[in-house]
Every structure is written in structure tokens, then in C-alpha cells.
Amino acid sequence: MKQTTFENFLKRLHGLTPDQTAILMQSVQDMTAQSAAQTAIDTTAGEGVCPHCGSSHRQKWGRTRTDAQRYRCSTCNKTFNGRTGSSIAHLQRLDLFYRVLEDMFGAVAPSSVRHLARQLGVNKDTVWRWRQIILRSLSQSITPLSGIVEVDETFVRESRKGSREWVRHEADPINHPKPPCLRWYEYKLLGVLKERGLNKWQLPVMTAIDRSGNRYAERLPDRKDLTIIQSLSPLICPDAALCSDFYPAYAKFAKTIGMSHVVLGTKPGSRKINQTFHIQNVNALHSRLKAFLRPFKGPSTKYVDGYVNWHFARNQSNAEQSFHNILRMSLQAVSVGTSP
């Protein structure tokens, strides 16, 4: 657009009604998201290889109808762009997908699926599927923890939302046995008291953090000694000083690795040693994690790892970086599958 035409366009904006202004702002927001997403796609395509054969020899081959840069492989003669072979290859509304990313990794708390769907004008199931695409692409980078390392576990209640195990049992009780857990409304209906404290329905989430701010969290299947040792062994440097509570598995892990171990109590006066050894940082991490999970009303157990990774990624990346990661991880998986 020429400068004079653009200036005339700006002058005419003063005559817009409030409703027209809102529509204009929405259009600008959509175009901005589309442009940012397209830039990320072109950047990723320029860094990657052919998703069909894995060759790095390619040439530019025009643009797609969505104005994405298309490439042609010089080895297999097939064309591709930055989304080919990725988990968002067939996504129609790339601008709305990018706005879901902005909501998930913005400065404010993420919106609920229903609220975000109303904002974007799409079905709630669409937003839910897009979120799952994003969560599956998230992973924690394992940085070895050194110095004083605080280790503890927090617990989340097992949730079988979406499993449909009771529906299958009632439809075919012979082939589908009765699920071990009651439905939520049956506790009050049958007068069954919920178990208090730690029980078999509480799933452990192992967390570790050092004084440099490096941290890691992982949902464990149980609290057995071998499970905890296998989880912590590749994570903590042997010359680190381990701070934990009195749970025996930590002592066995420290003895196995040969590292120093400081055991802290739960009573006042025993929670700190010389104002240096404590587990207050990891407890604060538990508090922030549970505050993040609380609005979701207990995510399903099979998605807990994704929500934990989401919580950590919110403090480490923004929407643009996350979009790059989704494309890069998807294309890496494709290139591994096509490599000889």
C-alpha cells in the first residue's frame, strides 16, 4: 500500500463506530497471529530437511495458497513446506492456533477451554485438540542438578476423566470388569467416605531443584526405592549435596551414588540446618504447581505429565518459541522415521 493511501486509510478510522472498531481490532489481531505463525513456519523450513527422504538439498519452489514458502527436494523431487509432516500439517486456522499458543504461554493465567473457544468462535473440542497437540510437543530439558539439590515429591489425585470405563462396564460387564474406583457422585450417594492422607489414589510427582534455579519434575508410577533411584540417577551430579525429608528412598539413593545427604525433619527447629540446608525452594515449587493445576479441576492422569511440562514451559518460553518447538520436534520425528 502506498504511503498516501495508508494515511488516508488512517484518517478514515476516526469515523468508525465502536462495533466497527472492535471488528477492526479483531481482524488486526488475527492477521498479526497469522503473520507470526507463517514467519515461524518459514524459519523452521529453512533450517530443516526434506520430510520425505531426509535430504538437505532443496530449492525454493513458489509459495502455497496460504503464502508459505514451498520447497522442492533435489533428491526425491517432492515438494514440501514448513508444516509438511508435522502435527499441524493439516491445520486450517493457523491464526487461531497461534492465539491458543499465546493464551497458553502469555503473562496472565490461561483461559478455560470453553472461554477461549467463545473468544475464537470455534468449538470447544477444537481448542481441546489444539491444546493436546501443544502439550504433546512439550518436554523438559534435563540439565544436571549440582551444588545443593532439594528433592521432594508432591501428590496429585488420580483422575480417570474421559476413560469411559464405567460406560463400557455397564454395556458389557462380562468383557469389561468393574472399575476399581467409584464415580465422584457415588461417594455421597452411597455414603462412602473418601480416604484421607496418602492412599493408592494419590500419584507422586517427583520434583528436584538446585540453588541455580535448574529444576525438574516427573510423575512416577509409585514411591518404590528402585523407581526413585532410577528417576534421580541421571538427574543429579554425584558431587552434589542432597537435601530431603526422612523418606528412606532418598537415603538409599545417596548411598548408591555416594553423595552427601542432609535429612531434614518436619518439626519446628529441624526444617533448616545453618540456614543453608532446607527444602523450602522445592516446597514453593509444589505450591506454584498446584496453584497452576487448580483451575483445571484435576486433569486426567494420562495428561498430568503434559500439564507439568506446560507449567515449566510457561516460565521459559513465549508463544513464538513454543510454536518453533512444536514444528521442530514434529519434523525431527519425521526425519528420524525417514532416515536410512
What is the predicted function of each stretch?
Residues 1-340:
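Residue-level recognition of single "structural anchor" positions
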